[in-house]
Amino acid sequence: MQSTLKNSKNIVSKILSNGGIAILPTDTIYSLSCITSNTNSLKKILKIKGRDAAQGMPILVPSIDYFNIYAQNIDNKIKKIIKTFMPGPLTLILNKKPDVSNLISGPNNTIALRIPDNSDLIDIMNKIKSGITGTSANLSGKIHSLDNYKIIKDLGTKVDIFVFGNYKVKNKKPSTILDVTSDKIKIIREGAIKKADIDNINF
């Protein structure tokens, strides 16, 4: 257990690079994270959560450049959305590249990506040169929590490190999810970013 992400960047980077599992604060809720290239780590996260692999897992990336590693057909409209709201609490569902693991891809060969508004987390991803899983740190079917002790009770013994976040607002919302796999933008989940914010983009 570590006190803050800022003071734990080196150890978190080492743990993730070595295939470990971490619970990390983001700009929204806690994430259950590992590097995306380690199949064993991905399987372990699915087992910890009790999550069906067919659901996929959202991926956090440090910059817009990483979108091209995981996704395809990223046109100017999608780039405009990314540049408008990221880093920030918006997740985009995109068409995945063929070589992306099925353990992190969603239905219909999709992938969910976002850039978190957390400079320490971005530093870690840049250091390890990888995106990380951003699935919520809770058991599948349970509501996400910002209560450190509840998370420790449910998941604390199953991960390699848990870094506390300075969450002052206890009702912090998860990211908004947009499906941009077709010409029509679909709001899958309205979270921290509202529908009106999306509608106000000038394409």
Task: Please identify what each model-predicted range represents.
Residues 1-203:
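Active-site-adjacent structural elements in enzyme catalytic cores
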